[in-house]
Amino acid sequence: MSFLGGFFGPICEIDVVLNDGETRKMAEMKTEDGKVEKHYLFYDGESVSGKVNLAFKQPGKRLEHQGIRIEFVGQIELFNDKSNTHEFVNLVKELALPGELTQSRSYDFEFMQVEKPYESYIGANVRLRYFLKVTIVRRLTDLVKEYDLIVHQLATYPDVNNSIKMEVGIEDCLHIEFEYNKSKYHLKDVIVGKIYFLLVRIKIQHMELQLIKKEITGIGPSTTTETETIAKYEIMDGAPVKGESIPIRLFLAGYDPTPTMRDVNKKFSVRYFLNLVLVDEEDRRYFKQQEIILWRKAPEKLRKQRTNFHQRFESPESQASAEQPEM
């Protein structure tokens, strides 16, 4: 099964074939323009091996070169600064010394137990990608072709996963208690909780729970935060009464979130918040945010193979904000 192929003019076609391409799983990823691409899926520590095939399209042609190489690259690109591209992994295998190609050739390559410290990611302002890069070095213009891979970071957590329970309110007007069953959720998990009204002296017209994603790029004064509402869950439509308790069930599997990503190579972070929103009869909106951790659960087969694998995140911190009076 061919991995990908590309034409470099009428002379030579470059093709990369992975050794386990027929059995390796593939994963999908949305590009910055909203299209969905499918590439081979790898995990941290897995080897990457295969063949680079160079096929001449026209018999009798020659291709002089200054060397042929393949690279395994991990790269972070900030969209608002295309010149600021950072490579956190760059492994090189020389395939051929300077010479001349007169016929089709194949070259074996292998990158052993490659460290892939971060998850592949494409967001509003940043892209983290892994790719194989084949270069035929020439005097004037190199022939270069890139082949994307997708990397997933797997995480396991100890049995302790504390629930979130808070009482919030507006003095003498509204007092509620909310509870979520966990503070850490895997990407296919269900957020279960409840809202309990202790005091209601303002007329609430609408109440919903939002899952908010915040992508933070840059450092210091150049920091940019992009906020996106991933999911909305209507808790109630109408006025609650004192003592009323309303259950919450939000299924994450339907929204395809990414894992939480903390200070990735000091370039960006991706964080998730549960945002409780109340709207009163005068259309004033009240918010209460609570950070949660999202993590990628290993498939059952891999969980058995990776019993020593463990990934930790720092504890989430609660944040609160409001356009109108804070709860």
From Swiss-Prot:
Acts as a component of the retromer cargo-selective complex (CSC). The CSC is believed to be the core functional component of retromer or respective retromer complex variants acting to prevent missorting of selected transmembrane cargo proteins into the lysosomal degradation pathway. The recruitment of the CSC to the endosomal membrane involves RAB7A and SNX3. The SNX-BAR retromer mediates retrograde transport of cargo proteins from endosomes to the trans-Golgi network (TGN) and is involved in endosome-to-plasma membrane transport for cargo protein recycling. InterPro entries: Arrestin-like_C, Vps26-related. Pfam families: Vps26. Keywords: Cytoplasm, Endosome, Membrane, Phosphoprotein, Protein transport, Transport. It is found in: Cytoplasm; Endosome membrane; Early endosome. The modification Phosphoserine is found at residue 315. It is a peripheral membrane protein. Residues 306-327 are annotated as: Disordered. The keyword Cell membrane does not apply. One of its GO terms (biological process) is retrograde transport, endosome to Golgi. It comes from the Eukaryota. Component of the heterotrimeric retromer cargo-selective complex (CSC), also described as vacuolar protein sorting subcomplex (VPS), formed by VPS26 (VPS26A or VPS26B), VPS29 and VPS35. The CSC has a highly elongated structure with VPS26 and VPS29 binding independently at opposite distal ends of VPS35 as central platform. The CSC is believed to associate with variable sorting nexins to form functionally distinct retromer complex variants. Residues 316-327 have a biased composition (Polar residues). Belongs to the VPS26 family. GO terms for cellular component: cytosol; early endosome; endosome; endosome membrane; retromer complex; tubular endosome; vesicle. It comes from Bos taurus. The keyword tRNA-binding does not apply. This is Vacuolar protein sorting-associated protein 26A. The gene is VPS26A.
